[in-house]
């Protein structure tokens, strides 16, 4: 009886331990983007870390502002395409090929990262450019000089029908 009672009381704990979902955010005025960039810049801990701020959010989708000042590891987003718009700066987007030194995804993440990327096609990106990374495709932002700020949206792709 005691075991049953303890099990019943502990059963909700994994649910309680989950992070709270972000509240829906339907609009961010363009005038607020410089403040989001400043916040991302202040939050950045290292040039190899991508600082992220939410522009808009309707689960399961987030429109993110990503702030980078250096090379970050290449990645593959399993089952997700990625739409990119360059807000500020320039970089080379390497797309395709394969990851080297693959690291398994973090728990709950659809993204794998690696230590390098081989066989990718380079595409220069500058302010105002758009790019789309297909699902399950290796990619990396390279040749970042100064600040590189993008808007990105990961798009969950429907399963292919055979």
Where do the language-model regions lie?
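Short beta-strand segments in beta-sandwich/barrel cores
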Residues: 90-93
